[in-house]
């Protein structure tokens, strides 16, 4: 996304904005149009009132690019006019941004990011998609900035995969195997419904450890995977993922707790008391 915007706008600035189910950044209410500034809200799910405020203030200079089903449905339910931009749950924000800005196919670097964000586990998942994601997100000892020529030079992209991405992926797999012993089957109870999940309190914060564990224990029937991070002193940050073949909608469940996301993956927070109220262990 940054690379695409830098190609289009030489003087683009990037701001880290707190948003979503935790809080809305106060700076959003203080932004004022100046006749030449455009705002791109990319991969970000403001509450509808905040989006409406920015749309009214900036008009077509406010561009919203997003793919979170919870945010898109919340906006649709208002009946308000759609802001400028592009929104589609079938692609990642990186792919949508490229498509919005350029009349050209997305490069491999963007395509792999797209597949990772949508959890499309094809034949390239472990050799290309996941290793490239580790480079992009600067995990472990990755260089802080990779050479942006990877978007046009596929040989350079392959060099980054071999030198950084694939070794880091192997190391991460080792960490996941070490964490597998901490997997707990739990039941999440909500509005009279019970969902059987595999739970892990994990610093890696995604479902791959749980999915791999589940493949080794197919006799355990679960609806999805719950990855948690205890944030002292008073809350849990949680990511919910659907298991293959499951009929649950992660975004719907997350919305009931004030969160949101995608049908297959979503996030929310719980206080310690709500965590103990809604989530219980069950026997394997």
Regions found by a protein language model. Name each.
Residues 114-187:
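Hydrophobic, aromatic-enriched interface-forming segments
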